[in-house]
Amino acid sequence: EAALTAAKAIHYVGAGTVEFIADPADNFYFLEMNTRIQVEHRVTEMLTGQDLVEWQFRIADGEQVPLQQKQITLRGHAIEVRLYAENPARNFVPSPGLVHHLRLPKDKPGLCIDNSLNVGDEVTPYYDPMIAKIIAWGGDRKDALHAIKRALNETQVAGVKTNVQLLSQIVRHPEFRDGNYNTGFIALHQDTLMAQSVSASDLVLALGTLFILLKRKEKISGTVVDTKDPYSPWNEEDSWRLNLPAQDVIQLMDGGREIDVEVTFIPGGYHLSLPNSSMTVSGALVGESDVEAILGGIQIKGTVALNGHELNLWLYDVNHILKLRDRALALDAVADTVDNLSAPMPGRITQVMVGEGTVVRSGALLMVLEAMKMEHNIIAPSNGKVEKLNFSVGDWVDENTMLLDFSPVI
């Protein structure tokens, strides 16, 4: 009623959003009116069954408002989350970059996805970093929460950091579930909501290792000699040894934990020695990122997105991030070195940590670029040697400019 009174007082006709702020005693106070459709218009549309964008076009074309307020009924409950390319762990600093993997829930009754981003698109630093909206409807708030949880479980993004994990934590928090929240909710529950990811389980490590082995096999399948003998050493991917099983080591990083997974090649699969167990694994790639596998006798379907030396894994709706070390970088790090050593956005070089001829290990800090009052670290994508520095401290560089020449060592 207060919103209608405000609109009538200024003879406003069209879509608009009136905002109020409420106190704990349910007193509310006028905040502002935006004379336009807002980001949250989908919530109203789901509750009313009306298309507000269509309304706005019709009104702009001179037509009358399609319905009067008394003709509009509200049904159910709707919740909207905004998916942002940002890093909650660093005070929500924007995370520009290329999107290498994107999988969003599909539209269906009770669920709406607003998105214009595709794999290969760039999230730039010049605009608001929102990349999608997910809106879920239910007969009541409990049903809507269940729907939004399920939708967030199905959301996968790699290449840029996002707030998807934070959103999942919020909608699962008991205080939020019970409606006990306000604008200080995140700060109040920061320790819970921003909790660091738990260490990857052996099952996750096995999935990541299997993915690397399958990708390696796929990568060299066109270069080996086909002898028609599946047990011929010339048909093995790597590490063949006379009179002994072929073995290899896949070197991973889980947060700050270095992990060496010992691999023994066996007919039809691999035997893995993991930190807390050993297991036999086998499987196949389905498309670019999906893996159908048997891990230690457990049949699973997982998703793995490889971006340079970083592995994003989704298993049982949980996202884990592993990094490849040393030889495992041979898959893609060399190909991605150029991208990793170019300026992510226009900015000024503030620090140079290496000189020409410096030999560095993977992950070493090479340069610091300042842009939009934020620092961006330029990291060595693999073990290697700095061949040439193209810029010095104080130099201004344009986006995608190659900052240095680097020779990887695999």
Features from the language model and the residues they span:
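Long, charged amphipathic helices and adjacent flexible linkers at domain junctions
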Residues: 69-75, 185, 190, 318-343
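Structured, non-catalytic alpha/beta "coupling" segments that mediate domain-domain communication
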Residues: 80, 90, 295-324
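A conserved acidic, glycine/proline-rich C-terminal tail/linker
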Residues: 279-297
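Active-site phosphate-binding and catalytic loops of NTP-dependent enzymes
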Residues: 8-15, 62-70, 300-301
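Conserved metal-phosphate-binding beta-hairpin within the catalytic cores
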Residues: 12-38
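Structured functional modules or segments
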Residues: 331-410
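Catalytic cores of soluble metabolic enzymes centered on carboxylation/carboxyl-transfer
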Residues: 3, 21, 38, 42-278, ...
